[in-house]
From Swiss-Prot:
UniProt entry keywords in alphabetical sequence: Repeat, Signal
Coiled-coil region list: none
Protein name per UniProt: Pre-intermoult gene 1 protein
Keyword Signal on entry: yes
Compositionally skewed regions (Basic residues) per UniProt: 104-172
Start-end of Acidic residues biased regions: 25-45, 78-95
Species this chain originates from: Drosophila melanogaster (Fruit fly)
Record's signal peptide: 1-22
Residue ranges, compositional bias (Low complexity): 55-77
Region (Disordered): 25-172
Annotated region described as 3 X 6 AA tandem repeats of S-S-A-D-S-D, given as residue ranges: 27-44
Highest rank taxon of the organism: Eukaryota
Tissues/organs with expression: Low expression in first to third instar larvae salivary glands.
Keyword Repeat listed: yes
């Protein structure tokens, strides 16, 4: 039940937003078209006692109060016309925002690069230490192998066998 109420709320909100957006564009279109048509112009015109026709100024003020005429004329301070000299007071922030963003990113990348370099050097050191430990262990093992091989060679040699046999004869 809660899901359906939530869904209904979103649908109503979406319809409301579309209605507001479409109503805003329709009011601009209606005000533009009413100035061109003769039937609506008659209702906006007032005749004076002398018979001259005076048009109402509410039509022009309504079209100028909407944001569309300012954007079309280019007199807004947020729009940059591409000229070298900038006399707009509010456009300084437009130039500051793109230049500050890459600086922050570069610092973050430098930190990441430094961290990666540190990690790589630490990994190299650890690998070298592991290799050194392996070398030490292997050298110890090699010494033991050599010693055991030497002992085995002595046992296998004829001199050693003769000595052993003589000693065993003497003992009895």
């Amino acid at each position: 039940m809660k899901l359906t109420k939530l869904w209904l709320l979103f649908v109503c909100l979406g319809l409301f937003v579309t209605l507001v957006v479409s109503a805003d564009t329709d009011s601009d279109a209606d005000s533009d078209s009413s100035a061109d048509s003769d039937s609506s112009a008659d209702s906006d015109e007032n005749t004076t006692a002398s018979g001259s026709i005076v048009t109402s100024t509410t039509e022009s003020s309504a079209t100028n109060s909407s944001g569309s005429s300012d954007d079309a004329s280019g007199s807004s301070s947020d729009v940059d016309d591409g000229s070298d000299d900038d006399t707009d007071s509010g456009s300084d922030t437009d130039y500051d925002t793109p230049t500050t963003a890459p600086v922050v990113k570069k610092r973050a990348n430098r930190k990441k690069a430094n961290n990666n370099k540190k990690r790589a050097s630490n990994n190299r050191k650890k690998a070298n230490n592991n290799n050194n430990n392996k070398k030490r262990a292997n050298s110890n093992n090699n010494r033991k192998r050599r010693a055991s091989n030497n002992n085995n060679k002595k046992k296998a040699s004829n001199n050693n066998n003769r000595r052993r046999n003589n000693n065993s004869r003497r003992r009895g």
